[in-house]
């Protein structure tokens, strides 16, 4: 019988970012209690040798599973020492992978208080609205002018420590495109 390969999208992440993610998840599960219903699985609770941890986030009948890996092949940079993250959507036997932005939006919708586009209409009609958004990572696009006015009126509180963001976890801070400096500021262009 031939080997059967499965392809997974694994985001390369440095070790310190994964450690920060794990700490934030545990803090908000056990101390602040903002991550109610989440479950954390340690590496020794998994049968797969490369799984470092799993965070199971229930969304009604669906489950979001964020898995961190170690011992993968080294990445293209020396700080990518074989660490990675996958984000999976599970519903019964159906499984698919989703991107970090969508994961943050789903977590935001199900777990954290927020005033959204419906709040604009409620505010105009004079109804009482939720005063602020607790999970800013869930807003990945610029809102309407009314929404921006509401956010300017009611500034979001900074939570210490911040809520765990999947997008922040997989963000690539080293491979951002280099900005070229002007002729005067570039040493290589001047030949000095």
UniProtKB/Swiss-Prot annotation:
It is found in: Host cytoplasm; Host cell membrane; Virion. One of its GO terms (cellular component) is virion component. Pfam families: Vif. Residues 40-44 are annotated as: Interaction with host APOBEC3G. Residues 171-172 are annotated as: Membrane association. Residues 14-17, 74-79 are annotated as: Interaction with host APOBEC3F. Zn(2+) binds at residues 108, 114, 133, 139. The keyword RNA-binding applies. Residues 171-182 have a biased composition (Basic and acidic residues). Keywords: AIDS, Host cell membrane, Host cytoplasm, Host membrane, Host-virus interaction, Membrane, Metal-binding, Phosphoprotein, RNA-binding, Ubl conjugation, Ubl conjugation pathway, Virion, Zinc. It comes from the Viruses. The modification Phosphoserine is found at residues 144, 165. The record marks 150-151 as: Cleavage in virion (by viral protease). It is a peripheral membrane protein. Residues 171-192 are annotated as: Disordered. Residues 151-180 are annotated as: SOCS box-like. The keyword Zinc applies. Residues 151-164 are annotated as: Multimerization. Processed in virion by the viral protease. Induction: Expressed late during infection in a Rev-dependent manner. Belongs to the primate lentivirus group Vif protein family. Counteracts the innate antiviral activity of host APOBEC3F and APOBEC3G by promoting their ubiquitination and degradation. Acts as a substrate recognition component of an E3 ubiquitin-protein ligase complex: mechanistically, Vif hijacks a host cullin-5-RING E3 ubiquitin-protein ligase complex (ECS complex) and the transcription coactivator CBFB/CBF-beta to form an active E3 ubiquitin-protein ligase complex that targets APOBEC3G and APOBEC3F for polyubiquitination, leading to their degradation by the proteasome. Vif-defective viruses show catastrophic failure in reverse transcription due to APOBEC-induced mutations that initiate a DNA base repair pathway and compromise the structural integrity of the ssDNA. In the absence of Vif, the virion is morphologically abnormal. This is Virion infectivity factor. It comes from Human immunodeficiency virus type 1 group M subtype F1 (isolate VI850) (HIV-1).
């Amino acid at each position: 019988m031939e080997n059967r390969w499965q392809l997974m999208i694994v985001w390369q992440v440095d070790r310190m970012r994964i450690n920060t993610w794990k700490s934030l998840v545990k803090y908000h599960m056990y101390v602040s209690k903002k991550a109610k219903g989440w479950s954390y699985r340690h590496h020794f609770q998994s049968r797969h040798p490369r799984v470092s941890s799993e965070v199971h986030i229930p969304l009604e009948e669906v489950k979001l599973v964020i898995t961190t890996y170690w011992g993968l092949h080294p990445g293209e940079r020396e700080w990518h020492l074989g660490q990675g993250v996958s984000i999976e959507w599970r519903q019964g036997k159906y499984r698919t992978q989703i991107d970090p932005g969508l994961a943050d939006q789903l977590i935001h919708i199900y777990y954290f208080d927020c005033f959204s586009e419906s709040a604009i209409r409620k505010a105009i009609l004079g109804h009482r609205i939720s005063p602020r958004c607790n999970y800013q990572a869930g807003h990945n696009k610029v809102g309407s002018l009314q929404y921006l006015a509401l956010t300017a009126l009611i500034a979001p509180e900074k939570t210490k420590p911040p809520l765990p963001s999947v997008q922040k976890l997989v963000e690539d801070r080293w491979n951002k495109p280099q900005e070229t400096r002007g002729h005067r500021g570039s040493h290589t262009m001047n030949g000095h």
